[in-house]
Amino acid sequence: MNFGERVHLMRRRKKMTQKELGEAIGVSKTTIFRIEKGDFADAMGQHIAKMARVLNVSADYLLGLKEEPAPLEPEPREQVEQEG
């Protein structure tokens, strides 16, 4: 499974639309569509980290370096409360 397929799979598991994922990471739904279809140029750097965070998987999983989508560690509650 390639990067785009993994993004698509995890987005569907989270019951998110392309628009919702795009809004969560600050890109258009067209960008998410292109990423899922294999145009990885749009997914470099900060977008990969943001997608992993929103989808609650490691960047290594999205990049195909790990086979299992291990969830990320939750942020400490006090840090989340300070940011909100």
What are these regions (language model features)?
Residues 26, 46-61:
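DNA major-groove recognition helix of helix-turn-helix/homeodomain DNA-binding modules
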Residues 1-5, 72:
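A detector for short, charged/polar N-terminal pre-domain segments
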Residues 5-24, 50:
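Short basic helix-loop element that most often maps to the first helix and adjoining turn
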Residues 64-84:
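Short, charged recognition helix plus adjacent turn
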Residues 26-42:
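Recognition helix of helix-turn-helix/homeodomain-like DNA-binding domains
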Residues 36, 47, 66:
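DNA major-groove recognition helix of helix-turn-helix
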Residues 7, 21-22, 32-35, 62:
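Conserved hydrophobic/aromatic packing and binding residues within compact polymer-binding modules
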